[in-house]
From Swiss-Prot:
UniProt-recorded name of the protein: GMP synthase [glutamine-hydrolyzing]
Record lineage: Bacteria, Pseudomonadati, Planctomycetota, Planctomycetia, Pirellulales
Pfam (any one): GMP_synt_C
Role: Catalyzes the synthesis of GMP from XMP.
Alphabetical UniProt keywords: ATP-binding, Glutamine amidotransferase, GMP biosynthesis, Ligase, Nucleotide-binding, Purine biosynthesis
Species of the source: Rhodopirellula baltica (strain DSM 10527 / NCIMB 13988 / SH1)
């Protein structure tokens, strides 16, 4: 179809290198949440993973190694590495470091000291983990990293590991600490500069350091943990039993800033604008004069990918929109409007509702729904891509959490936790080379990048939508009639929250069609109709979430409108479950 609209401005000047980055070492982060991704890219299939019982509980439960993330050449000037030993919050460490305008990368825990030396990070962070350092088979790091002269910060399991490696002792303790604790800082220089004598921190451990080597000095303590923080007297090695990366440690961000800026010497000048310039230049070099296909959905991830590609190669970009019948109300129209307003290139629309619904007929098991949706999408995308001449590259909205969760590993084997729709989703026989310009970014960074690229705020700040679309919000078997009910109810939820001025104040809001019916009275007649649940949450990172405390008046308007305007609904419930123990999506 012909495309109209404005052309995004091209970047001026040479790409600027990133100036600061930090690494986190990773044993294997099994995250309990799927980062929401575009429904028109590729399906997510969660794989079964055995749980481990561990002593340090602020962790995931995976006993496998995590990926060593492929090095990105334009992010190598200054960085911090995070070695992940299984913490579910390894990504949170990286995000907190990046908030200091310092680039941070997560790598597997067993990366060699030689490889670290080649990467030349400004600092290293050893994450928490579910194991006990004194148990056989517990994940270790290459102890040679302590001899590199690079500053090291160990958190929880990472502190215990560093302490043990350098002559200390770690034991299980009967006085376990879980939750908030008051910490007394006895040494408020270097990493604890600016802290009060006593501050709240977040603890989650059953093991702790029982003895430190002579070369170490205690920096902090709690009522039950004499070595809540330590430092080496001769080497730039620090450890803390508490978790500075979580919001329950109110001044944890300051602690991490002290480490990466003051101790590691990063200058805090990494900017997304630099990232965009470098990414555009990288795309131009990779693509040359060939054509690129991009799956477009109207979500922020695919839109930012398209914006980067368009600024880099202009009319060499072709986009495909697969309408699978599982989209939100007026989704296709919204995509077309946004596309025509911001890109001047061709868009291919595949009308595939009948095909998807036929494949889903009679299926009520969530994982089987995902599998069938993924298979149907691949076939539709493959058929349409074959119609585009000279297409050589496929662009995907892969994000950094997708890469970590899927075990995408350049330097060694890694177990796959989730078969992510954005990581190797299309079959190899398509013959495309992949372009993944966002694979180093978190969701919040993608949003900021979208604003840098000139995308409208209403697009950049749209709430995330799950990969399988409304299929995971329509519990039980999916039918066309059920989707009509759900789509209308969902639109009312979003519209009322927008009218109340609370859309940007909430992280995700939607309706769920429950697989039950309930008795009601409408007029003078008995009804036996559908029940709808309303889900609205607030979160900074989608790893944990609280239910949104919406005003009663707003909830009443939502309920009244759904019951009055959506045929076949006589009951509306509000989901007040937090994550954990519940997940954000119902399936």
């Amino acid at each position: 179809m012909p495309a109209t609209g404005i052309t995004l401005p091209s970047p001026s000047g040479p790409p600027l290198p990133c100036s600061a980055a930090i690494f986190v070492l990773d044993h294997r982060s099994r995250l309990p949440w799927p980062f929401p991704v575009s429904p028109l890219l590729f399906y997510t299939a969660a794989l079964a993973f055995p749980a481990i019982s561990g002593k340090n509980t602020m962790t995931s439960s995976a006993n496998t190694t995590s990926p060593a993330i492929a090095e990105t050449t334009w992010l190598t000037d200054q960085r911090i590495l995070v070695l992940d030993f299984g913490s579910q919050y390894a990504q949170l460490i990286a995000r907190r470091v990046r908030e200091q305008n310092v680039y941070c990368q997560i790598v597997r825990h067993d990366i060699s000291a030689e490889r670290i030396a080649e990467l030349a990070p400004k600092g290293i962070i050893l994450s928490g983990g579910p194991n006990s350092v004194y148990e056989e088979g517990a994940p270790k790091c290459d102890e040679g990293l302590f001899d590199l002269g690079i500053p090291v910060l160990g958190i929880c399991y990472g502190m215990q590991l560093a302490c043990q490696a350098l002559g200390g002792k770690v034991d299980n303790t009967p006085s376990r600490e879980y939750g908030r604790a008051m910490c007394e800082f006895t040494d408020r220089d270097s990493i604890f500069r600016g802290m009060q004598e006593s501050e709240q921190v977040w603890m989650s451990h059953g093991d702790q350091v029982s003895q430190i080597a002579d070369q170490f000095t205690a920096m902090a303590k709690t009522s039950t943990c004499p070595y809540a923080a330590i430092r080496h007297n001769e080497r730039p090695v620090f450890g803390m039993q508490f978790h500075p990366e979580v919001t329950h440690t109110p001044h944890g961000g300051q602690i991490l800033r002290n480490f990466v800026i003051d101790v590691c010497g990063c200058d805090g000048s990494w900017k997304l604008g630099d990232f965009a310039d470098a990414a555009i230049e990288s795309i131009r070099k990779q693509v040359g004069n060939k054509r690129v296909i991009c799956g477009l959905s109207g979500g922020v991830d695919s839109s930012v990918v398209a914006a980067l590609l368009y600024k880099a190669i202009g009319p060499q970009l072709s986009c495909i929109l697969v309408d699978n019948g599982l989209l939100r109300k007026n989704e296709q129209q919204i995509v077309l409007e946004e596309f025509s307003n911001h890109f001047k290139t061709d868009l291919h629309i595949v009308e595939a509702e009948d095909r998807f619904l036929a494949d889903l007929a009679g299926i009520d098991e969530p994982q089987e729904k995902r599998r069938r949706i993924g298979h149907a999408f691949i076939e539709c995308f493959k058929d349409e891509a074959a119609k585009i001449e000279d297409a050589h590259f496929l662009a995907q909205g892969t994000l950094y959490p997708d890469v970590i969760e899927s075990g995408a590993d350049k330097d060694g084997p890694a177990a796959t936790i989730k078969l992510h729709h954005n990581v190797g989703g299309l079959p190899e026989e398509l013959g495309f080379e992949l372009i993944e310009p966002l694979r180093d970014l978190f969701k919040d960074e993608v949003r900021r990048l979208g604003l840098e690229l000139g995308l409208p705020e209403q697009l950049v700040w749209r709430h995330p939508f799950p990969g399988p679309g409304l299929a995971v919000r329509c519990l039980g078997e999916i039918t066309r009639d059920k989707l009509v009910v759900l789509r209308e109810a969902d639109a009312i939820v979003v519209e009322e929250i927008e009218n109340a001025g609370l859309y940007r104040e909430t992280s995700q809001a939607f309706a769920v069609l429950l697989p039950v019916q309930s008795v009601g009275v409408m007029g003078d007649a008995r009804t036996y109709d559908n029940a709808v649940a309303v889900r609205c949450v607030n979160t900074d990172d989608f790893m944990t979430a609280d239910w949104s405390h919406l005003p009663y008046e707003l909830l009443a308007r939502i309920s009244t409108r759904i019951i009055n305007e959506v045929k076949g609904v006589n009951r509306v419930c509000y989901d007040i479950s937090s994550k954990p123990p519940a997940t954000i999506e119902w399936e």
